[in-house]
């Protein structure tokens, strides 16, 4: 019975160490993929992507009650998950500046002659075919949302890679612990029994 428990402890140790190594390899590979893919996009922060510069721009645009980024990517190539998230935060402020502080849902659906916009197709400006003209400013939010989602996904993938590395190390340590326990506890009890 002792032999069975000892071998079971060693088997558990091998499985835990193998899973730990697998988690480490996959996580490091995932973080590398995030870095490589972001680098390929050649994203560089604009000069206003510092906390002080964006605060001045937001004030100039009349934005109030808006959470401003506290990170900085001005002049830096965005090639990490954290930098991608920071860049996305600045894009959000830029979109608010471009749309007068309104989000996509707050903007009227159609354009009007007076520039105020409307949600009523009957009051909307018409194109050459007599169809209501869409509010072009809403496209700013469509683009911003798509790009910010991609950047935030890169951040999430990078953080999952970090988590996987920690889990991998924990599994390896647990596997080593199982091996030590199997060897020490069961060997020690067989020596005492003799």
List PLM regions with ranges.
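Long, solvent-exposed extracytoplasmic domains/loops
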Residues: 45-144
């Amino acid at each position: 019975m002792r032999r069975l428990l000892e071998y079971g402890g060693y088997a558990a140790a091998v499985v835990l160490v193998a899973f730990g190594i697998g988690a480490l390899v996959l996580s490091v590979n995932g973080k590398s993929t995030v870095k490589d893919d972001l680098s390929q996009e050649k994203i560089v922060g604009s000069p206003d992507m510092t906390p002080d510069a964006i605060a001045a721009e937001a004030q100039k645009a009349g934005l109030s009650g808006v959470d401003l980024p506290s990170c900085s990517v001005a002049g830096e190539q965005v090639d990490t998950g954290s930098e991608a998230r920071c860049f996305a935060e600045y894009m959000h402020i830029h979109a608010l500046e471009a749309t007068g502080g309104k989000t996509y849902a707050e903007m009227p659906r159609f354009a009007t002659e007076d520039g105020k916009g409307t949600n009523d197709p009957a009051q909307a400006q018409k194109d050459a075919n007599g169809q209501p003209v869409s509010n072009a400013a809403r496209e700013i939010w469509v683009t911003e949302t798509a790009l910010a989602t991609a950047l935030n996904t890169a951040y999430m993938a990078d953080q999952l890679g970090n988590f996987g590395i920690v889990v991998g190390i924990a599994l390896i340590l647990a596997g080593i612990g199982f091996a030590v326990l199997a060897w020490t506890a069961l060997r020690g009890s067989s020596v005492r029994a003799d």
